[in-house]
Every structure is written in C-alpha cells, then in structure tokens.
Amino acid sequence: MGPPQAARAPRRGAQLVAAAMALAVVSGGIGGGVGVALDHQSPAVITALGSPTTQAQPVAATPGSIQQVAAKVLPSVVQIQVIMGSQGGEGSGVVLSRDGLLLTNNHVVESASGAGNGAITVTLQDGTSASASIVGRDPSADIAVIKMANQSTLIPIAIGSSANLAVGQNVVAVGSPLGLAGTVTSGIISALNRPVSTGGAASGQSSVLDAIQTDAAINPGNSGGALVNMNGQLIGINSAIASLGTSSSSGAQSGSIGLGFAIPIDQANRIDQELITQGTATQAVLGVSITATPAGALSTSTGAIIAAVSPGGPADKAGITAGSVVTRVDDRVIPDGDSLVAAIRSHAPGDTISLTVQDSTGGTHTVQVTLQGITVKAGK
C-alpha cells in the first residue's frame, strides 16, 4: 500500500512555531523496518549484563493490571498484510468471530479491493497465517470487515462500550506497529469527541472521525488494532496519529508523539454489523453543506456555518437555512465544520438530535432533527 497520505489536522488554537502538525493514518509499508537499530540481514545480538543462569518464572498478573489486560487481548488481535506485486502494506485487526470475521480500518485493506487486487494475509498471535477476503468497507468511517479463511477456533475480542468513557481513564493499545506483532502500549484517554480528518491510503477519500484521543503509543502498523479498557474490552479502533512534519522527502512516516486517535467502538460496531449482514453500511446525514475554514486559518466565530441546505432533507424540514450557524449538537459544543461532520457521523440514521442554531439576525434557537441515512458505496 505504501506510506499513507498525510491529511489536514484539526484546527489548533495557536500556531506552531518551526514545526507543522501532520495527521496520518497509521498503516505501515512492508519492508521498511524499524530503522537503523534493526538489520534484516542478521539477527540482533543482545548482551545480558549480570543475568542469572537459571530461567526466571513469569510474574503472576495482578488483577486489573496491564499484564492481565495484555494476556486477555493479545490472542484476539491480528497482523494484516496486503501485497500487490512488489508493493505492500500492513496493519492490525481484531477478531469478531470464531469463524474468522475481523474488524480493521478501511485504509489498511482498501488496496486489496476492486482494481487494487491485492492479496490479504492475516497472522494470528501464535504465528498461524491464512488468506483473507473483504466482506465490506465503509471509507467514510474508515471501517472494514474481512474474513480469514478456514477458521473455527479464533478467540473473539470482548466488546465494550464507548458511551461512558472519561478523560483520564487508563487504556491499552494492542497491534503491530512497524510489523512488530503483538505490541502492547498503555496510556490514558486524553480527549473525547475529537474531530479528526484523515485521507485514505489508496483512494484519497477523506474520513472525518469522531475520535477518542489517547497518549498510548500508536505508530504506523497500529491501524485497525485494539484500544481497550482495563477490563480488556474493546472501546476503540486505533486509526490515526498526529506527528510533527519534517522537511524529509523520503515519504517515511513519523512515529508517536503521544497524539493517537481511535474510532469509538459504538460507532465501529454499528457499521461492522451492517457490513457483515448486508455488505454495505449506512451513514447519517443532516442534509447540509458547510462553509470550510481555510487550512491554517483561525476561526473568527464559534460554530459550523451552513453554506447550503438540501431541499426536503432533515435540516430543511427543521427550518435551518443557508447562512445559519450550528453551535451545539445536543450538549456538545460545535466550534467548526469538522466538529459538526464528526458529531453527525457518530450517530445512526433515524436518530433524533437537538441542534442549537444561530440565524442571520443573531437570534439563537433549538430545533429537533431526525437524521436520514444514505448507503455508503464501496466495492469489495
């Protein structure tokens, strides 16, 4: 798949001096290695200083510890490789069913769809490998489901909920960064409902994620892997990182700077169930287009400015007009257009939401809107 494209980071409140923020999906290229510390031609030699000659016994895991979480989750996280001739890419995935259904990011496997015609190989924690095929994709949400061939004894991951997460909550990330399968990192939830705009690795189609932000180390290859709570329950799908841009022309991706983003599992699980049952997913729509804020510009007002309203759509039926400014969705403050897109996409078609709207006269009122749904078109 090659290095994924960098995309625009969410607007920040202050300029960065001497360093640009870049946001990238975190699938990795095959064959790049970890860097000069690893030599693929010869094994690394590690010299132990003062080590005892007897083999130490594993330390028993403390209940609720990262060690216990890792032991529970690792068998349910896989490494995914997509090969297209001499090119390839890699990422991670989580096990949904004993017979081989796996959840991952669309950008991990999209190059194996349609004319891409790449071959997908999945490797389990025990080293077992098998081919896989795409069940369905939703590029707009960066979600895909694939199925590993000839499986019946996989260990599905425990599904949690992203509805009651809290900033500061401890979390664990599991995946295959830089091809290092079964890597476990830990951190906290740094923020919730973070609008994150990313570009697809192959198609270039953008996704706006309503993301969980974490400082757990996430690197290229972690895409599609698990973000879990301290009960070992899946709460998010790791998808993107922010990194400091450099002047390098090599195309290499930067690593973690403590700004990782995951798709909340409640949204991902709704979509994966639609993909499994019908092969396509639906997306909630408000029926508006939004005035974009130029990249790098600071907003002069708070809210998402409505540029146009689709006749007969949900916003039109609620009396929202072009030029209006949406400042809240339910109790959530909407500072800009990406925030409105992320908030709407976090809902399911048919959900009724409350919008706080400022009209052209400066007056503010609240309207109830029932979201419509559209089918996301994406080939297998």
Where are these regions (language model features)?
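N-terminal activation segment of mature serine protease catalytic domains
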Residues: 30-92, 273-277, 377
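C-terminal recognition in membrane/secretory proteostasis and scaffolding
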Residues: 1-44, 133, 270-380
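Conserved active-site neighborhood of the chymotrypsin/trypsin-like protease fold
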Residues: 82-89, 97-182, 338, 343, ...
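Interdomain regulatory linker/hinge segments that flank or connect interaction modules
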Residues: 38-42, 51-57, 239-291, 374
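Active-site loop architecture of trypsin-fold serine endopeptidases
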Residues: 84-89, 108-118, 154, 174-186, ...
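Short, conserved beta-turn/loop elements at beta-strand boundaries and strand-helix junctions
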Residues: 98, 137-141, 192-198, 239, ...
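A conserved glycine-rich beta-strand in the N-terminal activation segment of trypsin-fold
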Residues: 12-20, 60-66, 81-99, 129-133, ...
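Terminal peptide-recognition signature
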Residues: 30, 34, 75-80, 93, ...
